[in-house]
């Protein structure tokens, strides 16, 4: 083994022993690297296998060519990028490098230092919004005719506080002139916390390792939600009561689907109030509007028509959707609050 590295016939016995030990260490390091690489590969395969387990319980339905054509015509398979964070709120590189903005950014930094006690006090308002506020109003101050002060001169504490108050006042006046901030649509249901329904508690007790029930969505069904040609329940992002029901692995799958025409989605189980289980798929689509803007929706598909038919759902019915976990698998529970439920249970 040692001859393959170096010809050391001229070395003494102790030198040969040292080199031999060195080669053993090198071979050991290579073996450890290969074992770590194999272990990471196994972990990655286990994560993928977790997502495939749902198809063992509920085989995926074969989609007809008619449904595929209708979905393509309706534009549901179009993809686009989205972000939960509005990057337009942050200054661009050109704005940061602009000398006219240097003093404004410096003033914002001084205000942050001056308001350090507010950060220490939990009852006070977070200052992150103040930082974003200063960045947004930095561009509007370019029109001021005042001589810019020397940026190398330290900013006095009183001046920083005064400048911040002026920025707030100008922002409030500007919002009044433009009609104020656009308010988000309010769901027709109460947003207050509700206890887990008794029937759902019983269902989770019967299922293996079921836990973490969350009320995530409430809706009055539209005609498109019960139309057999649509075969999906639309859940707009803006109407979700909470969006923390996906794991990191499931979120990565949903994010990768954004740029794919053929979306994979996340497998899940839906339980109705009759304790019947259905296999569904959760996917993310962009709904295009005539104005050119779009909105992102979650959609429950691949079995939704069967759920509508079995529960007698119709336009105008009110439903609530809960999420929970059973053996790590994503599960949904549909609570129906309408006369249709009484007819189905009879």
Swiss-Prot record:
PROSITE patterns: B3. SUPFAM superfamilies: DNA-binding pseudobarrel domain. The keyword Lipid biosynthesis does not apply. Gene3D superfamilies: DNA-binding pseudobarrel domain. One of its GO terms (cellular component) is nucleus. Residues 237-338 bind DNA. Pfam families: At2g31720-like. The keyword Transcription regulation applies. Keywords: DNA-binding, Nucleus, Transcription, Transcription regulation. Residues 168-187 are annotated as: Disordered. One of its GO terms (molecular function) is DNA binding. InterPro entries: At2g31720-like, B3_DNA-bd, DNA-bd_pseudobarrel_sf. It is found in: Nucleus. PANTHER family: B3 DOMAIN PLANT PROTEIN-RELATED, TF-B3 DOMAIN-CONTAINING PROTEIN. This is B3 domain-containing protein At3g25182. The lineage of its organism: Eukaryota, Viridiplantae, Streptophyta, Embryophyta, Tracheophyta.
């Amino acid at each position: 083994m040692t001859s393959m590295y170096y010809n050391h016939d001229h070395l003494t016995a102790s030198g040969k022993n040292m080199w031999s030990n060195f080669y053993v260490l090198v071979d050991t390091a290579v073996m450890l690297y290969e074992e770590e690489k194999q272990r990471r590969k196994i972990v990655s395969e286990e994560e993928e296998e977790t997502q495939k387990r749902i198809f063992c319980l509920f085989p995926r339905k074969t989609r007809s060519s008619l449904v595929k054509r209708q979905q393509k015509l309706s534009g549901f398979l179009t993809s686009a990028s989205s972000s939960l964070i509005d990057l337009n709120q942050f200054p661009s590189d050109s704005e940061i490098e602009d000398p006219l903005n240097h003093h404004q950014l410096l003033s914002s930094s001084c205000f942050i230092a001056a308001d350090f006690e507010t950060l220490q006090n939990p009852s006070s308002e977070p200052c992150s919004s103040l930082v974003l506020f200063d960045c947004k109003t930095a561009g509007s101050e370019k029109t001021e005719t005042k001589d810019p002060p020397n940026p190398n001169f330290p900013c006095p504490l009183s001046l920083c506080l005064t400048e911040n108050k002026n920025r707030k006042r100008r922002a409030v006046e500007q919002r009044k002139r433009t009609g104020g901030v656009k308010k988000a649509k309010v769901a027709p249901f109460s947003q207050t916390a509700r206890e887990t329904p008794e029937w759902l508690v019983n269902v989770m007790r019967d299922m293996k390792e079921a836990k973490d029930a969350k009320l995530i969505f409430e809706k009055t069904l539209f005609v498109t939600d019960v139309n057999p040609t649509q075969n999906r329940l639309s859940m707009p992002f803006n109407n979700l009561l909470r969006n923390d029901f996906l794991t990191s692995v499931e979120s990565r799958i949903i994010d990768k689907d954004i740029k794919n025409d053929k979306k994979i989605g996340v497998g899940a189980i839906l339980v109705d109030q009759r304790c019947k289980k259905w296999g569904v798929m959760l996917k993310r689509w962009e709904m295009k509007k005539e104005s050119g803007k779009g909105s992102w929706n979650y959609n429950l598909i691949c079995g939704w028509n069967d759920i509508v038919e079995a529960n007698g759902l119709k336009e105008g019915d009110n439903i609530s959707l809960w999420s929970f976990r059973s053996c790590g698998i994503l599960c949904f529970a549909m609570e129906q609050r309408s006369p249709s439920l009484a007819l189905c249970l009879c």
